[in-house]
Design a protein with these regions (language model features):
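Beta-propeller folds
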Residues: 1-171
Length: 171
């Protein structure tokens, strides 16, 4: 907002095409909070709503039921400085789990969660940055990503399995 003016109030609404009913989600958002992304999951009863506090140092991921309007906090990620925007575009949802980037240990790494919000595994680890999460191949069990593992000046494409076996795919 412009200096001296109040923040806009934001909310999430859904519209049922069959019943022509609009519903407001019961999202416990700070009065001056942001909603930077809303994404569909693989489950029609779970809408992913991503929120940030005003200082942008706390990220919350809620799963909302579009019919009941109930929202459940699945994940909270905090930073002593700020949450980078690439976190929102690197969250991917699968039928039983989701994966996302986080800098909670000081480096950007890939994390794998159950749809209940429980951490299954920190997929990547080390003194390097995962720049982009490219996807997960459910058949082969590989996560694909780009990172600067060899040099902070260049990035390469890698795949890693659930046990941590990593393969560099680019030159």
């Amino acid at each position: 907002p412009k200096a001296g003016y109040p923040n806009s109030k934001v909310e999430v609404r859904t519209y049922d095409i069959k019943s022509h009913v609009t519903r407001t989600m019961k999202l416990p958002l700070d009065a001056d909070g942001y909603i930077p992304r809303i994404r569909f999951t693989k489950d029609a009863n779970k809408l992913a709503i991503m929120t940030l506090n005003r200082h942008q140092d706390r990220f919350d991921l809620y799963f909302a039921d579009p019919r009941s309007t109930l929202c459940k906090l699945m994940l909270r990620d905090e930073s002593p400085y700020y949450i980078k925007e690439n976190i929102f575009d690197n969250i991917q949802f699968y039928p039983e789990y989701f994966s996302m980037l986080s800098e909670r240990d000081g480096y950007s790494h890939l994390y794998w969660y159950s749809m209940g919000g429980n951490l299954i595994k920190k997929v990547t680890n080390g003194k390097f940055e995962v720049k982009d999460f490219l996807g997960y191949d459910e058949e082969d069990g590989y996560f694909y990503y780009t990172s600067n593992e060899e040099s902070p000046l260049r990035k390469a494409v890698y795949k890693i399995d659930k046990k941590g076996k990593k393969t560099k795919l680019s030159q």
